[in-house]
Amino acid sequence: MGLYNQSVNNPIKKFFRNKFIYFFTLIFDKLIFLSHGEYEFAEQKYFNFKNKMYFLPFSTDVDFWNTNKKKNYESPRKQILFIGNDGKRDYDFILKLASEIQDYDFVIITKKIENNIKLPKNVNLLSGKWDDLNISDKDLRTIYEESHLTLIPLLDSLQPSGQSVALQSLSMGTPVIITRTKGFWEPDKFVN
């Protein structure tokens, strides 16, 4: 994911990066892409290796990420959820938004924001990552149930980002606002 993202400005690094990617593409039998944008980019740039490239749509376990609980949109305080740890999330944006919209509660689950910084009073920062045990999937499912909206602000890149959070949230009946990037995994499947 993100291997073909061309964000290197240094000409020497760019030269060696391009050689590495060409060699990588040459030696492997199959290259699987989770982002349709990156898949199309790689197909165009390395068209001689097109037969090795496959787009695999990202999915989620809809049996687990499911709820019958109805959202209470009439509640006086509404909860906005942000989850993520990869380098393409826009952490500055979510913190700025939380400080500007004080009448919403923000639950931010990440290890990328230090808990020693001054946070707005409406922010509940939870340290969590998919591969640690700080927050179980069952706990996360409850947080999705309690949230009125999931925000996934992203920095522009060919690297796909936010698929699991978006699909889990939608499966739980929680609407999602996500940045459309060059690496958006299946842009034709999402509207507005």
PLM region descriptions:
Residues F64, N72-D137:
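Conserved catalytic-core segment of nucleotide-activated headgroup transferases in glycan assembly
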Residues M1-K14, K30:
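A short, histidine- and acid-enriched strand-loop-helix "catalytic/donor-clamping" loop
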